[in-house]
Amino acid sequence: ADKKIALVGAGNIGGTLAHLIGLKXLL
């Protein structure tokens, strides 16, 4: 369960970073 939470948290962080990078590219 702890590993799942860690993976989900890392996925959310990665998604947020990818989203921010995408916004920078558009701007």
UniProtKB/Swiss-Prot annotation:
For this chain, the annotated S-S bridges are none
Q: Which UniProt keywords apply?
A: NAD, Oxidoreductase, Tricarboxylic acid cycle
| UniProt catalytic activity | (S)-malate + NAD(+) = oxaloacetate + NADH + H(+)
Question: Binding of NAD(+): at which residues?
Answer: G9, A10, G11, N12, I13, G14
Q: What's the Enzyme Commission number for this chain?
A: 1.1.1.37
| Gene Ontology terms for molecular function | L-malate dehydrogenase (NAD+) activity; malate dehydrogenase (decarboxylating) (NAD+) activity
UniProt-listed GO biological process terms: tricarboxylic acid cycle
Per UniProt, the enzyme's principal EC class comes to oxidoreductase
Q: What does this protein do?
A: Catalyzes the reversible oxidation of malate to oxaloacetate.
Stated family: Belongs to the LDH/MDH superfamily. MDH type 3 family.
Indicate what this protein is called per its UniProt record.
Malate dehydrogenase
What is the species listed in this Swiss-Prot or TrEMBL entry? Rhodospirillum rubrum
